[in-house]
Amino acid sequence: MGCDRRELTLVGAGLAGSLLAILLSQRGWKVTVYERRGDPRIKGYESGRSINLALAERGRHALRAAGMEQAVMAKAVMMRGRMVHGLDGSQQLQRYGRDDSEVIWSVHRGDLNIALLEAAERTGATIHFHRRLHTVDFDAGTARLIDDRDDQGHDIRFATL
């Protein structure tokens, strides 16, 4: 067996980065991920983003492809529509679809990110936290990352970024 394994360096271990790490690792890629924030499994999830995330069929399809749909949907809450409150005190439900087959689901963003991080590591991805991208030289295939805990620079080589 030769050295045919494709390598990818990802910057960002949020929802998209973690999901991509899972999908590529499952397909035999050697994936290394660098994330600016600390590990949310250690210090808790901190983000300025909304607490919950609305998950539609397209998102469920991506989770299904990664083998994560069942675990995530076990904690999801169905949302059939939005409630409109009139000035006169009336309330009207505006459904997202025709029936309960056309709904969106509410999931906790932090819990979803942690589940995806854990799955990415289980599939073989390596994740480095506290590494903020500073500079990239695509021609040389190098990048400089800064550790936010001590402002030290770390130079890496990458095949694909």
Regions flagged by a language model, labelled:
Residues L53:
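Conserved phosphate-binding/catalytic loops and adjacent sensor/switch elements of nucleotide-binding enzymes
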Residues V11, S25-G48:
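Glycine-rich FAD pyrophosphate-binding loop
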Residues G2-E7, A56-L161:
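Conserved N-terminal helical subregion
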Residues G14:
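Glycine-rich NAD(P) Rossmann-fold beta1-alpha1 loop
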Residues G17-S18:
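N-terminal Rossmann-fold NAD(P) dinucleotide-binding loop
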Residues G48-S50, E102:
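Short, solvent-exposed beta-strand edge segments and adjacent coil->beta transition regions
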